[in-house]
Structures are given as structure tokens and as C-alpha cells.
A protein has these predicted regions:
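Membrane-embedded beta-barrel scaffold of Gram-negative outer-membrane proteins
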Residues: 83-95, 121-181, 202, 208
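Conserved C-terminal beta-signal and adjacent last beta-strands/turns
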Residues: 30, 77, 81, 92, ...
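Outer-membrane beta-barrel translocator domains and adjoining extracellular loop/strand segments
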Residues: 2-12, 51-60, 102-110, 156-164, ...
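Signature of Gram-negative outer-membrane beta-barrel scaffolds
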Residues: 1-85, 100, 213
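Transmembrane beta-strands of outer-membrane beta-barrel pores
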Residues: 2, 45-51, 94-100, 107-109, ...
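Gram-negative outer-membrane beta-barrel transporters
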Residues: 144, 149-152, 173-267
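Residue-level signature of outer-membrane beta-barrel architecture
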Residues: 19, 29-37, 72, 80-83, ...
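Extracellular loop and loop/strand-boundary signature of outer-membrane beta-barrel proteins
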Residues: 7-17, 28, 58-67, 111-119, ...
């Protein structure tokens, strides 16, 4: 369905080279006042150079010229961990972070994704607090973790949908202010070298905090404090693995694995618009995968087989586009190192 005219499509110009270079440099300092207390501080320097087609039209499509830009930023943060007692640890961290745009966000996919070469990096203030518990009793081990997340983001890179000439396409833009709050829970149990089972649950609430419409200081946005569209906000996974050590030959391992992913249904567009009963939704989905692998010579050789989505459930991406159904994979790996 690509619409091509000469060396151009609706969403890009193939004759203009597309270049991006990312560099991230970091420096950290760690202090251990005691065996139970650990403090670290760090700084990161981000730099990105982009060169490629930029549209001169107001809708960002067509009439491309070749332009370049460079973005740089300094991020920093600190983290603190403390053992309340032997098996219980608390972690607290803060980071002034930046997320550089990806290749698809900058240049699209040259088909049905329109990139935006002059996207700004996302900048955010991130705070994380978590408690973790790890206890061993005989051949058994239990690990549990609970965490809180807070993220205040400016220039949030948002993907949207539009229609041009009867063709739907995706596009990217910087959205002024977004705030994220949430929590995650994890639990893992393992028995010796034979078995483990675990799972995670996440609840992430991302909302629009841009109070006024772009270009206006008076008109309040109807999406203010409304959950951002196209983002799942409750999801979970479970995985279990069985290991048969020294099968046939000492050092060889047979492993059988199962994992699943659940995701609730969520609105395709802004949830405060449209009739509740007829609203476009990304459906709830629940997928299951199975894997079998045999490792030989202490990891030098590995043969694996996998069946993904073995129940052939209908799965969708964040824009309600259906993913592939049941699929089978095989892989053989050889490690040539010592």
C-alpha cells in the first residue's frame, strides 16, 4: 500500500540519506559507609546528531528538504540502598533522565510510518522506591519485590494516527507534559537447580499534564489529567522452568519452559471522548509460550525449540493491529570461546 512517486513516498524522500548518531557517556561514584548501606551518584552526557528529510508543509507530509540538527543534554542522579535486616533491602533512586528518539521515530519506516526528524529528546525526573526480600531455606529460595514509580516527563514522544488520501499512517510528535505513577510486584520461587516459577504484575498510570492547548495560554485542554491513549496500564506475566541437569552426559542440561503474558483492554483513543459502549478498544489478551532446549558440553552447544502463542489467541499491538498467530522456532547455537 506504499504510494511512491519517483524517489519519494507520501511519508519520506528516498533520495535523501537518513543519518543518526547517538553517544552516551557516563561517570559514577560509589560510597559504602557500611556493609548495609550503599550510596552512588552518577552523571550522563547525551548527544545525538540527525540528518535527513524534513517536510516544509504544515501537516508534516511531503515537500521534503535535507536538514540536520544536533541535540545534547546532561543527566544526573543518585541511588541509595540499605539492608534493613539481612534479607530485606530498601532502594531509593532519583534520575534526571533523557530519552533520545529512535530511528523509527525520526525517519519512520518508509511505508506507513511518518517520522519527524526534529523531535526533541524526552526529559524526565524519575523517582523509584522499592523493597526486596530474598531468603534461602535449605534447597528453597524465595525472592519478592514491590516498587513504586514516579516519572514527570517533558517533551514526551507520542505516537498518533492520521489519514492521508484514504491511507492510515502513524506519526510522532513531542507532547508537552506527561506524568506517570505506578507500582510493580514480583515474586520468584526456586528449588535447588531443578525448578523455578515466578511472575510480575504492573500497574502504570500515565496521564496528560499539559493543561493548556499548544499555542494557547487560555484554553484548557480537554485531555488534561486524562490517561494517555494506546498505553496498557495493567499487565502481568508468569514463567516457570524445569531443569534436568546432567541428562545423558555430565554437564548437559535439558530445560523446559513456560511463560505467559496478560494485558487488560484499553482505549485506542482518548478515553474521555466518545460513547463508552461503542468506544474503540484494544482487546484484552492472554498469550502462552512453550520452549524446550538442550545444552551440551557445559554450554558450548545449544539446541532449542519454541512455540509462541500455542493457543493461537488473537493478539494485538497498542494500536489494535493484529499480531501473528501460533508460530514455531528452532535454533542451534555454537559457542567458539574457551
Amino acid at each position: 500500500s506504499r504510494s511512491t512517486i519517483g524517489a519519494s513516498s507520501k511519508f519520506t524522500d528516498f533520495s535523501i540519506p537518513k543519518i543518526t548518531r547517538k553517544n552516551v557517556s557516563g561517570l559514577s561514584y560509589r560510597l559504602m559507609p557500611s556493609d548495609r548501606w550503599n550510596v552512588s551518584a552518577f552523571a550522563k552526557y547525551y548527544r545525538q546528531y540527525n540528518k535527513g528529510p524534513v517536510s516544509q508543509n504544515t501537516d508534516g507530509i511531503g515537500n521534503y528538504i535535507n536538514l540536520s540538527n544536533t541535540a545534547s543534554a546532561l543527566g544526573y542522579g543518585a541511588a541509595d540502598t540499605y539492608f534493613i535486616w539481612k534479607d530485606l533491602q530498601v532502594k531509593l533512586s532519583y534520575e534526571k533522565a533523557f530519552r533520545l528518539p529512535t530511528t523509527d521515530e525520526l525517519f519512520g519506516d518508509e511505508d506507513l510510518e511518518a517520522g519527524k526528524m526534529n523531535l526533541k529528546p524526552e526529559k524526565s525526573d524519575n523517582v523509584n522506591l522499592s523493597f526486596s526480600y530474598n531468603h534461602q531455606f535449605g534447597k528453597h529460595e524465595l525472592y519478592a519485590e514491590a516498587g513504586l514509580i514516579y516519572r514527570d516527563t517533558k517533551d514526551y514522544i507520542k505516537r498518533g494516527l492520521d489519514v492521508l488520501g484514504g491511507t492510515s499512517y502513524g506519526y510522532y510528535e513531542n507532547h508537552g507534559h506527561v506524568r506517570t505513577k505506578g507500582y510493580n510486584l514480583s515474586l520468584l520461587y526456586s528449588f535447588s537447580r531443578w525448578f523455578d516459577i515466578g511472575g510480575t504484575f504492573n500497574s502504570i498510570d500515565t496521564r496528560d499534564y499539559e493543561k493548556f492547548l499548544a499555542g494557547s495560554s487560555l484554553q484548557e485542554s480537554m485531555h488534561y489529567k486524562v490517561r494517555m491513549p494506546n498505553l496498557p496500564y495493567r499487565y502481568a506475566n508468569i514463567n516457570a522452568n524445569f531443569y534436568w541437569n546432567d541428562l545423558f552426559v555430565k554437564g548437559n542440561v535439558l530445560s523446559i519452559g513456560y511463560d505467559s503474558y496478560w494485558q487488560h483492554d484499553f482505549p485506542l483513543y482518548w478515553e474521555n471522548l466518545g460513547d463508552k459502549d461503542s468506544k474503540n478498544m484494544v482487546p484484552e489478551q492472554f498469550s502462552h509460550n512453550l520452549s524446550l532446549s538442550y545444552t551440551m558440553k557445559n554450554g558450548r552447544y545449544n539446541v532449542s525449540f519454541e512455540c509462541r502463542n500455542f493457543t493461537d489467541a488473537q493478539l494485538f499491538d497498542n494500536f489494535s493491529l493484529q499480531k501473528a498467530g501460533r508460530a514455531f522456532y528452532g535454533k542451534f547455537r555454537v559457542f567458539f570461546g574457551k
